[in-house]
Regions:
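Regulatory nucleotide-sensing modules
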Residues: 1-12, 16
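Structural motif
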Residues: 18, 40, 62-64, 138, ...
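Cytochrome P450 core scaffold surrounding the K-helix E-X-X-R motif
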Residues: 21-25
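Cyclic-nucleotide recognition modules
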Residues: 32-92, 96
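Polybasic "coupling" helices that flank or enter modular domains
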Residues: 78-144
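Phosphate-/nucleic-acid-contacting segments
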Residues: 119-175
Length: 175
């Protein structure tokens, strides 16, 4: 959907589907930054810094997106206070999520970090039972752990009665 330097400096809204936003380390390893779901917007941060185009966006399933170039988007923001406010609220939500993830990475072991992320997904779904919104290898990358560690921690959470899991279907049993 987007690659660094593809010449499409734009704001993208995901109309349907799911996508992951990631960067590549110097040695070529993928680092998942966030997950886009239906209705999410990406790229608006480049309204302030058009030199920093280093993120990839990859569809995780059939997806449709709408994009608008930056100069047109800036004009639209000037005409629509409601859109400007929505954008500020989205920035705030992302900032809170980024801070929460940074705290988790720096202060929590892998198991509690995984469980906290699963609880967040359940909260987003509005149910203790939900479908994991991304592949386990991408979840591991997002959490800053290896896929092997993720697998071990999933097994521990199941054995300790915190979750049940059948494929990507997860149920939180206790919090």
């Amino acid at each position: 959907m987007h690659s660094p330097g593809d010449g499409r400096l734009s704001v993208m809204s995901l109309d349907s589907g799911k996508a992951k936003i990631y960067s590549l380390s110097e040695d070529g390893h993928e680092q998942v930054i966030s997950l886009m779901q239906q209705g999410d917007i990406n790229g608006e941060e480049n309204l302030f810094d058009t030199e920093n185009d280093d993120l990839f966006i990859e569809a995780l399933e059939d997806s449709t997106a709408c994009s608008i170039n930056y100069s047109d988007f800036q004009k639209l923001l000037l005409k629509s206070p409601e859109l400007s406010l929505h954008l500020l609220n989205e920035f705030g939500r992302r900032l809170v999520t980024a801070q929460k993830n940074a705290v988790r990475r720096n202060s929590m072991e892998a198991g509690p970090r995984l469980f906290a992320a699963l609880v967040d997904y359940a909260d987003e779904a509005g149910s203790n039972t939900f479908t994991l919104p991304l592949k386990k290898k991408d979840l591991a990358s997002l959490l800053g752990i290896t896929p092997e560690t993720l697998s071990r921690e999933f097994t521990k959470l199941k054995k300790e009665g915190y979750i049940t899991a059948k494929g990507k279907q997860i149920t939180i049993l206790k919090q």
